[in-house]
Curated annotation (Swiss-Prot):
GO biological process, one term: DNA-templated transcription
Catalytic activities: RNA(n) + a ribonucleoside 5'-triphosphate = RNA(n+1) + diphosphate
Name of the protein this chain belongs to: DNA-directed RNA polymerase subunit beta
GO cellular component term of the entry, any: DNA-directed RNA polymerase complex
CDD domains reported for this sequence: RNA_pol_B_RPB2
Function: DNA-dependent RNA polymerase catalyzes the transcription of DNA into RNA using the four ribonucleoside triphosphates as substrates.
Similarity annotation: Belongs to the RNA polymerase beta chain family.
Length: 1360
């Protein structure tokens, strides 16, 4: 296999037994692809999706009078004014201007009013401004008002039809009541439900229920039509004493014979006997077409159609009448010989519709529609037109009802209609089919749906959500436009005059700013960002609420396999409602989640991969990824464990149709990063995957010794690393940028020959962690497309590195690791292993107040010189200044209201000109508990406000940086163009004298070296073709220069213009303070297996346990944390980590020996390490220099990869330990650092990747003096943010009671808590220097009294 530039530097030893046929898809594709399909920026011809689809559905808008119309033509998105970084800095939204091309068509008023025959009088075309559309950044986020936000995808119930039952919970009898619901994408919901009397009802939008026949009547069906639609008929010939039933024998099955059934004078079934399949067979063989039955059989049957007297035309018996003796008598009297009755077999089909029809009070179509109108619009007067309009708009009009493409597909599939497309509104046939299917389910001929399967839940991604917001905004615009169009001609209006963009802008802005699904991006480390973008939430508008969501909807469902991760979900109230996409999952065009499988044909695994949704998966038999397959792809076992119809079954290998693509297919990105996941309990794996997202990036990232092989994928797809856009050679590198000269073969015609990558240096993330990029390449390195050029936060050589590899021992140590506490060595702190940088942004605003403008200045009243020492003359802190709690960062004074001065004060003021008393100090100071170094200052000034010296110097610096980039870019491009010109001129004969070179002289390299590029451009040779080619290249160089000059002017104008600031703000100063935080007692740490704890002590190195070679342990963990938690993966990680480190030490020893055959030795040893088991590595592809570089990078340990559910075998860990000359047990003899004595037993020692979590004691430590109190109870508030107190609870009271500390206890429960009067007295006594405390009545007692009174019990306090 080919290795990339960074992979060659350090190979991870992969122990996976099966290599995936499919590479992991782009982890951010769900966000990026959805948004791109919404805006269709690259499409010349736009498809009917996204923004284009919305505009097409709303336009054309026609005037009420029909003489004017606005038509949609096309739309355009302009280039944003500022790039992403500038938007973050300025606090503005990264958005593009949306312009829509519209035609205002005016029709001739004298012509026809018919749509097709209208005569066009005038067309006015105009590009109309329709607001700002926030754009997605390359990383799948949005910058809204300067902060990065992520729009989380939503999992909601799919449009279509669903059949369910209440599990017998609705009615006291426990009877199961079946129901069905047609859910549109947009429009009224339609519910059909049975009551406990087995009558069928309909509800529209969950309103009052109506008999289902009312809806059928409203659709235009008569009683006869209804009965004919839902029932089979039995024709009956009436005789004097009997009747002949024209009935199929099958219709009699499972019924009890009400009379003797006679065939050829032989009784086949006796009266009172149940008719079985055997009887039906006999009747069928005899060819019976009709059965003779006594007239009594017709009693209690239902007549199918109206029976009319042929002579008079009157209805004798109406349809749906139950036959009685009177009815039979009436038939006999009127000599009716033929009737039709409904075929109702109590064991097979019920008479639900017939019974419901009898309840229905409506008789005609208009009555039925009136009935529906009264339910939908109670209290409103019902006219025939209004009634018809409402009914038709409910389900049958596109503008009010939309099933969507998904809804139609789901509806058709469930109703057994072969085609997947159709109208997006309901038809009469749809409604009838749904009712028929519901009756079938009730009769036991079909089953209800599983509402929690992913076949009935779909993902609504970002593109679809913005599309819906746009539709909401445009519908608001439509009303106003329709009214305005009437005046279009008389007032000579243009499309821009008619269309107000504010409703559209407001809808989009509201969605991004305040929607539950538009969230502040989790940016602690690269993994947290990737996971946030891949999150799928069932909450949000149109979704579930956490209070109402039951257990079933939160539970893991078999259809989640390979689509949603069964492990990664939050703990707490949102458990199961917020999920994460599995690694390979993607959404299809309908929004359903799909997962890839390899096709299996006749027991042989093919190379063909298909993506399957939960809808299609139900028919397949799917084998697991670990099924044994031989070299030819044949399944080796006869019986294979498979999934089929949501069950695990053992099937013959020939029955298998699909096989999993990879063992990690089931899990999410975070869960796939946990080595030995298969050995961890699910609850701890959940904590492990959640805690990895909280790991703070440390100063020097270190790759995990034990990984899973997906680390490189996460680092690349998170976009925190810098990857090469083209192949080429590294021209220049420094800490802040990388310049690549691109291979001329790799560039397209219009692309530049140089790539400049500006690195992000010490930038602040949303969670105040540090984003910093460090170059990995050196000048002269040859790189190819996709190579990692620079590491970002928490990445090491292009691999995700969230923590540090620490030497761990599992043993108790003087109680310091009681209850998951962690003991760490002082060496860890000294080596800055877990030192992190946190950057805080502090902002000062200079506002224009009623009393005059605030001023940013270093001249602040009543402030000492030392306090101002870190400010420049403008009043802004210097970059590089060390600041601590209370220091001024930006000096600012605010005008005070004028006080009335005495004549003496006025005189003094006039003499000394003292104005200090007119202003008060309102400077920006750093918080009392904070300290750090100022790393950056940005000053923004409003337009037409003069910039101060500091702002001008910052602007000049920025311009200088841009100019340097442009100059470097141009010099490389210019150099490349003239290198090509020299190559073309080489060997040609000069046709025009230049300087001291005569005509006819042949050009050589030496000759051309004497001339600069300016002169070379003037060379003319005898070959006309070469002259033309040279002229084209010279023209190209000039064009590039002009292009760069234009770009520089544009950037300069951007910097010089004023900033967009909030109303009333004249100037804004942003100060960035970086704080270095070392590991200390109280910080939270964790492994990747849910093994978390708090540091209890930082022990001196000399006191830590040590090994026989004198090396000390870094971290001591409690062995009791393993068995009950059942996360044994951490122990296996420690063993494998120990082997990895030991192998690194052996490689280091070979390198340090420097023997003549060192390279050969290293090759032999690396071959033993890498080709022990699992994926084979071909080291012959490496040159000797590359092998030595690889070996040097492996000094600190050979990184291992043990993929989830396909990990390293136990014997392989033992083989590696043996190869590293370490004990196979993974246990060593440890010695006590304090006494030097050996411990009683051997201890498990090894290396574990430990993380420092973003729960730092510095941020949590807090002490209250006095502060705010709760309004009702008058007790102190809780929490650091509210400057609250510590809760002194019931158990703490017991503790003080046990020690008899009566005075302390009284203080705690009264004056320190909610005794208002006592508090005031306490202050007074402290001021007076007295030590007396007197407690009065606590406020909580008054609250209790009030609560008792609210129950109607009068409580009064008697004074004694």
């Amino acid at each position: 296999m080919a290795y990339s530039f960074t992979e060659k530097k350090r190979i991870r030893n992969n122990f996976g037994s099966r290599e995936s046929i499919l590479t992991e898809p782009d982890l951010l594709a769900i966000q990026i692809d959805s948004f791109n399909s919404f805006i269709q920026a690259d499409n010349k011809i736009k498809q009917d999706i996204g923004l284009h689809n919305v505009l097409q559905s709303v336009f054309p808008i026609t005037a009420v009078n029909g003489y004017a119309q606005i038509e949609y033509v096309d739309y355009q998105l302009k280039e944003p004014k500022f790039n992403v970084e500038e938007c973050k800095l300025r606090g503005v939204t990264f958005a593009s201007t949306l312009r829509v091309k519209l035609n205002l068509v005016l029709f001739d008023k004298n012509g026809s009013t018919l749509k097709k025959k209208r005569k066009v009088k005038q067309i006015i075309e105009e590009d109309v401004y329709l607001g700002q559309l926030p754009l997605m950044t390359e990383t799948g986020t949005f910058v809204i008002n300067g902060t990065e936000r992520v729009v989380v995808s939503q999992l909601h119930r799919s449009p279509g039809v669903i059949f369910e039952h209440d599990k017998g919970k609705t009615h006291s009898s426990g009877k199961i009541l079946f129901s069905s619901r047609i859910i549109p994408y947009r429009g009224s919901w339609l519910d059909f439900e049975y009551d406990h009397h087995e009558h069928l009802y309909v509800r529209i939008d969950r309103r009052r229920k109506l008999p289902v026949t009312t809806l059928l009547r409203a659709m235009g069906l008569s009683s006869e039509d209804i009965l004919e639609t839902f029932f089979e008929k039995t024709p009956v010939k009436l005789k004097a004493k009997s009747c002949d039933l024209s009935m199929l024998p099958i219709h009699l099955q499972r019924t009890i014979a009400e009379f003797d059934i006679v065939v050829n004078q032989h009784v086949v079934v006796e009266k009172g006997r149940r008719i079985t399949a055997k009887h039906v067979k006999l009747l069928g063989k005899a060819g019976i077409k009709s059965i003779n039955a006594p007239l009594e059989y017709l009693l209690d049957k239902v007549i199918c159609a109206d029976i009319i007297n042929k002579d008079t035309g009157e209805i004798l018996i109406s349809a749906n009448t139950i036959t009685s003796e009177e009815v039979l008598e009436l038939l006999n009297t009127n000599k009716v010989k033929k009737i039709e009755i409904l075929y109702i077999n109590s064991s097979e089909t019920g008479a639900y519709i017939s019974d419901t029809l009898r309840l229905d009070e409506t008789q005609t179509e208009i009555e039925a529609r009136m009935s529906i109108y009264h339910v939908m619009r109670p209290g409103e007067p019902a006219t025939e037109d209004a009634v018809n309009l409402l009914f038709n708009n409910l389900f049958f009009k596109n503008d009010r009802y939309d099933l969507s493409k998904v809804g139609r597909m789901k509806l058709n599939r469930r109703l057994g209609i072969s085609r997947e497309t159709g109208e997006h509104v309901l038809t009469n046939d749809d409604i009838i089919r749904v009712i028929k299917l519901l009756i079938n389910i009730k009769d036991g001929n079909d089953s209800v749906d599983d509402i929690d399967t992913l076949a009935n839940r779909r993902v609504r991604a970002i593109g679809e959500m913005i599309e819906n917001q746009f539709r909401i905004g445009l519908v608001r615009v439509e009303k106003a436009v329709r009214e305005g169009l009437n005046l279009a001609e008389t007032d000579e209006l243009t499309p821009q005059d008619l269309i107000n963009s504010k409703p559209v802008s407001a809808a989009v802005r509201e969605f991004f700013g305040s929607s539950q699904l538009s969230q502040f991006m989790d940016q602690v480390n690269p993994l947290s960002g990737v996971t946030h973008k891949r999150r799928i939430s069932a909450l949000g508008p149109g979704g579930l609420t956490r209070e109402r969501a039951g257990f079933e909807v939160r539970d893991v469902h078999p259809s989640h396999y390979g689509r949603l991760c069964p492990i990664e979900t939050p703990e707490g109230p949102n458990i199961g409602l917020i999920n994460t996409l599995a690694v390979y999952a993607k959404t299809n065009s309908y929004g359903f989640l799909e997962t890839p499988y390899q096709i299996v044909k006749n027991g042989k695994v093919t190379k063909e991969v298909i993506y399957v949704s939960a809808i299609d998966e139900i028919t397949h038999t799917i084998a697991q990824a670990n099924a044994l397959v031989d070299d030819r792809g044949k399944l080796m076992d006869d019986l294979i464990s498979c999934r089929h119809k949501n069950e695990f079954v053992l099937v013959d290998s020939s029955e298998v149709t699909l096989i999993d693509i990879d063992s990690k297919q089931i899990s999410s990105v975070a869960a796939s990063l946990i080595p030995f996941l298969e050995h961890d309990d699910a609850n701890r794996a959940l904590m492990g995957s959640n805690m990895q997202r909280q790991a703070v990036p440390v100063l020097k990232a270190e790759k995990p010794l034990v990984g899973t092989g997906i680390e490189r994928v996460v680092a690349k797809d998170s976009r925190v690393c810098v990857t090469a856009k083209h192949g080429g050679v590294v021209e220049a590198v420094d800490a802040s940028r990388i310049v690549i000269r691109v291979d001329s073969k790799k560039t397209k015609a219009n692309e530049l020959g140089v790539d400049i990558y500006n690195l992000t240096k010490y930038s602040r993330s949303n969670q105040n962690t540090c984003i910093n990029q460090k170059p990995l390449v050196r000048t002269g390195d040859k790189i190819t497309f996709g190579d990692v050029l620079a590491d970002g936060p928490s990445t090491d050589m292009g691999e995700l590195a969230l923590g540090q590899n620490m030497k761990i021992a599992f043993m108790p140590w003087n109680g310091y690791n009681f209850e998951d506490s962690i003991l760490i060595s002082e060496k860890v702190v000294q080596e800055d292993r877990y030192t992190t940088i946190h950057i805080e942004e502090l902002t000062a605003y200079s506002r224009d107040t009623k009393l005059g403008p605030e001023e940013i200045t270093s001249d602040i009243p009543n402030v000492s010189e030392s306090a101002l020492s870190k400010l420049d003359e403008v009043g802004v802190v210097y970059v590089g200044a060390r600041v601590k709690g209370g220091d001024i960062l930006v000096g600012k004074v605010t005008p005070k209201s004028e006080t009335v001065l005495s004549p003496e004060e006025k005189l003094l003021r006039a003499i000394f000109g003292e104005k200090a008393n007119n202003v008060k100090d309102s400077s920006l100071r750093i918080g009392a508990s904070k300290s750090g170094v100022v790393i950056d200052v940005q000053v923004f000034t409003r337009d037409r406000v003069e910039k101060d010296i500091r702002a001008l110097s910052i602007d000049a610096e920025r311009l200088e940086r841009i100019k340097k980039d442009i100059d470097d870019e141009f010099s490389i491009i210019d150099g490349d163009i003239f290198r090509r010109i020299r190559l073309k001129l080489l060997g040609n004969v000069l046709s025009k004298a230049i300087g001291d070179i005569r005509i006819g002289e042949r050009l050589s390299i030496k000759l051309m070296k004497k001339f600069d590029n300016k002169d070379i451009a003037k060379f003319k040779v005898e070959n006309a073709t070469v002259n033309k080619e040279v002229a084209v290249l010279v023209k190209q160089a000039k064009a590039k220069k002009v292009e760069f000059e234009k770009f520089f002017k544009k950037e300069k104008a951007k910097i010089n213009e004023g900033a967009e600031l909030p109303p009333g703000v004249m100037k804004m100063v942003k100060v960035y303070v970086a704080t270095r935080k070392t590991l200390q007692v109280g910080d939270k740490m964790a492994g990747r297996h849910g093994n978390k704890g708090v540091i209890s002590r930082v022990s001196p190195v000399e006191d830590m346990p040590y090994l026989a070679d004198g090396s000390t342990i870094d971290i001591v963990l409690n062995p009791l944390g393993v068995p009950s938690r059942m996360n044994v993966g951490q122990v296996l990680e420690v063993h494998l980590g120990y082997a990895a480190k030991g192998l690194g030490y052996k490689i280091a020893a070979i390198l340090d020996e420097r023997r003549p055959d060192m390279v050969k030795q290293i090759r032999v040893f690396l071959d033993k390490v890498y080709n022990l088991h699992g994926k084979k590595e071909d080291l012959t592809l490496f040159s000797n220099e590359e092998i030595i570089e690889l070996a040097n990078n492996l000094r600190e340990g050979v990184p291992m990869a043990t993929p989830v559910f396909d990990g390293i075998r136990e014997q392989d860990i033992k083989s590696l330990l043996r190869l590293a000359d370490l004990p196979e047990s993974g246990q060593e003899q440890l010695y006590d650092g304090r006494t030097g004595e050996p411990f009683d037993r051997h201890v498990t020692v090894g290396y574990m990747h430990m993380l420092k979590l973003n729960h730092l004691v510095d941020d949590k430590m807090h002490a209250r003096s006095t502060g705010p109190y709760s309004l009702v109870t008058q007790q102190p508030l809780s929490g650091k943010a509210q400057f609250g107190g510590q809760r002194f609870g019931e158990m703490e009271v017991w503790a003080l009671e046990a020690y008899g500390a009566a005075h302390t206890l009284r203080e705690m429960l009264t004056v320190k808590s909610d005794d208002v009067a006592g508090r005031a007295k306490m202050y007074k006594s402290i001021v007076d220097g007295k030590n007396l405390t007197e407690s009065v009545m606590p406020e909580s007692f008054n609250v209790l009294v009030k609560e008792i009174r609210s129950l109607g019990i009068d409580v009064e306090l008697e004074q004694h």
